Amino acid sequence: MLRLFRRSLRSPLHPPPQRGPRPIRRWQAFLLIPLFLLVLPPAGISRAASDGNREAEIALGHLIAMKGNGFAGSTACAECHRINGGGMPSVGIPRIAGQTATYIYREIRGVQKGTRFSPFMSRVVRNFSKSDIRAVALYYSTVRTPKLHDPSEFDPSLQPLGRRIARRGLWDRNIPACILCHGEDGRGIPPNFPYIAGQSKTYLMQQIKSFAVVDRKDDPEGLMRGIASKLKNREIKAVAQYFASLTPPDYGKIPEQNSPKRLRLIPENLNGKEVNHP
């Protein structure tokens, strides 16, 4: 009887139990970590990339950039960064056109959390939701704007020193080359390391000094804080001037389907208005 019962368990109606997957050993798990990081979507914008509403989010970002998000005290991003993302070089407001959405998202969140010191920006973005930030970040990441005029004083004698710090570093004082993180000619290493080529001298000097005195502390492992604190004033001026003299990168033309109303935003439009191109 017992033999018949066991035979019935091996019948098609009772297939034998399947073996489960073999457990992953610890050393195998460590090998999978780099692969996991490569395929992991960038924080903050993964939803935007996957839900099929990218065009709508960019259009929302364009609206917030022009008018704010509707909360009391909310100011349009274009008031300072301009609708073309060119910023205001004369007063050190950075260009954000063409920066990666991941980086812009991270920096706005940093202002909200207090890891990036900016009293004015903190008032502007304090009521921004993550969806608002995602939309604005996506919008400005698609904008392409030629370099604006930087009225800062240019000292030709500083250029060789700035180039040396940028490209070779000052290893005798444990100061690495800037291009190791910010890319060849300051073009950035997307998505996490921003381009700094073509930023204004005033802005770059402000940020290096902000890292040096730990007003800004959103750098991974305190890397920029450690570097900035070792630079002398003349070296800060030199490296800021060098990168300000370079041309900002263009990561490609705006895909038509991602550009609301197919706008081309040009630096002459500093009054927050757009110009349609044919």
Regions found by a protein language model. Give the residues of each.
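The canonical Cys-X-X-Cys-His
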Residues: S74-I83, V136, I175-D185, V239
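Bacterial N-terminal signal peptides
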Residues: A29-L40
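A short, charged, Gly/Pro-tolerant segment at domain boundaries
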Residues: Q257-G272
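N-terminal secretory signal peptides that target proteins for export/translocation
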Residues: M1-R25
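Electrostatic cytochrome c docking/interface patches
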Residues: S46-G73, T142-W171, N269-P278
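The feature marks the first
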Residues: A56-G114
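Sequence context surrounding c-type heme c attachment/ligation sites in exported
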Residues: H62-A78, A101, R167-I179, P194-Q206, ...
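Axial heme c-ligation environment in periplasmic c-type cytochrome domains
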Residues: E79, M88-R95, G110-E153, P190-Y195, ...
